[in-house]
């Protein structure tokens, strides 16, 4: 039994492979308990603050439902619902909320903000997404891979295809090297992955048996892969001005049925943290169609709706894994 009580959850860099497996095992057990109606509440009477400086569907719902299932109460502080960063510093906000709440979630901008909250709050702080990292998403991804593949994570070959500089590329690389995976980032050279992070991850890979490959060659990058993963080409907070250049660079990297076939693996799966621009059924999708003539962006509609896609299992698992993080760090054992 691992005791992760009162630990912050800021990045998977802070956790050992055994601790990450513990989160995944706990999430699996909590999911089974919810499905069978045998869930035991371990956070009764706890109060949790959810700070969201960026919009959210899955992360907010996962924290709210997970907390409610476990008997905790939540306060949602949206983009206009608190003074953090505007009238009050992150350090001061942390010291106020830490007096009132048992745990604090933060979704927003710089990684340094969530780290400051953790330094000053005196209660567990959980990273719901920053510009640099998205660790709760990675737990959901790895639980989903466990459910769909009859082999351990250290035998998985995984390619992230698209914007190699965004927070999902970073977060997946960190998680993958911790768990000993064969991990590839397949991205244009013009969008480089953070060199210091790559170097750090290669150091970890040397200890865990993982492999890290950064390439702009799609065929080489996806060959033999079990999982192809992508994310939006323009992340929250990036200016509209980057759309045109990103589309030009990344259109050849759209994940589609042909790319799945390039893996040579009939059991390969497609994953995406969502939301995905795979059709014209959203305001942004319509705008992209009008401006750039594209009816799909980072993933083809055909692949998104195909048997290879496990994106909605992945989305559901956000709740089970986030619940596991809260129970492990805050719950009564």
Curated annotation (Swiss-Prot):
SUPFAM superfamilies, alphabetized: Aspartate/ornithine carbamoyltransferase
> What Pfam family is a match, any one?
OTCace
> Where does it localize?
Cytoplasm
Q: According to the UniProt record, what class of enzyme is this?
A: transferase
- A GO term, aspect molecular function: ornithine carbamoyltransferase activity
The protein's Enzyme Commission number:
2.1.3.3
Its recorded reaction(s) are: carbamoyl phosphate + L-ornithine = L-citrulline + phosphate + H(+)
Taken from the UniProt entry, a GO cellular component term is: cytoplasm
Q: Which residues bind L-ornithine?
A: 167, 231, 235-236
What pathway, per the record? Amino-acid degradation; L-arginine degradation via ADI pathway; carbamoyl phosphate from L-arginine: step 2/2
Q: Which domain of life is it from?
A: Bacteria
Q: Write the record's keywords in alphabetical order, separated by commas.
A: Arginine metabolism, Cytoplasm, Transferase
Q: What is its main location?
A: cytoplasm
Provide a GO biological process annotation.
citrulline biosynthetic process
Binding of carbamoyl phosphate: at which residues?
56-59, 107, 134-137, 273-274, 318
NCBIfam families, A to Z: orni_carb_tr (TIGR00658), PRK04284.1 (NF003286)
Family from the record = Belongs to the aspartate/ornithine carbamoyltransferase superfamily. OTCase family.
Protein name as catalogued: Ornithine carbamoyltransferase
Biological source species: Clostridium botulinum (strain 657 / Type Ba4)
Which gene is transcribed and translated to give this protein? arcB
């Amino acid at each position: 039994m691992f005791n992760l009580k009162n630990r912050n959850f800021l990045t998977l860099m802070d956790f050992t492979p055994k601790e990450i497996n513990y989160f995944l095992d706990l999430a699996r057990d909590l999911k089974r308990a919810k499905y069978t109606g045998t869930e035991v509440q371990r956070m009764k009477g706890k109060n949790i603050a959810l700070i969201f400086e960026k919009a959210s569907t899955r992360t907010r719902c996962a924290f709210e439902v997970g907390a409610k299932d476990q008997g905790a109460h939540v306060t949602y502080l949206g983009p206009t619902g608190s003074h953090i960063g505007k009238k009050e510093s992150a350090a001061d906000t942390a010291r106020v909320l830490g007096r009132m709440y048992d745990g604090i979630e933060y979704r927003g901008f710089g990684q340094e903000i969530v780290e400051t909250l953790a330094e000053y709050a005196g209660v567990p702080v959980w990273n719901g997404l920053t510009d640099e990292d998205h660790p709760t998403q990675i737990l959901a991804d790895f639980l989903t891979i466990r459910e769909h593949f009859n082999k351990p994570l250290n035998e998985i070959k995984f390619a992230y295809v698209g914007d190699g500089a965004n927070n999902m590329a970073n977060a997946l690389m960190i998680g993958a090297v911790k768990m000993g995976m064969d991990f590839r980032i397949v991205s244009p050279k013009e969008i480089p992955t953070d060199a210091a992070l790559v170097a750090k991850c290669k150091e970890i890979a040397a200890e865990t048996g993982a492999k890290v490959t950064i390439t702009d060659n799609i065929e080489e990058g996806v060959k033999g892969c079990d999982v192809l993963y992508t994310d939006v080409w323009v992340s929250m907070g990036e200016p509209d001005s980057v759309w045109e250049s990103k589309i030009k660079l990344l259109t050849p990297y759209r994940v589609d049925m042909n790319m799945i076939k390039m893996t040579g693996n009939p059991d390969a799966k497609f994953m995406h943290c969502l939301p995905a621009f795979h059709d014209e059924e959203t305001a942004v999708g319509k705008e992209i169609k009008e401006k750039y003539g594209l009816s799909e962006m980072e993933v083809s509609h055909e692949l998104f709706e195909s048997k290879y896609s496990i994106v909605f299992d992945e989305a559901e698992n956000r709740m089970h894994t986030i619940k596991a993080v809260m129970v492990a760090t805050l719950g009564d054992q």
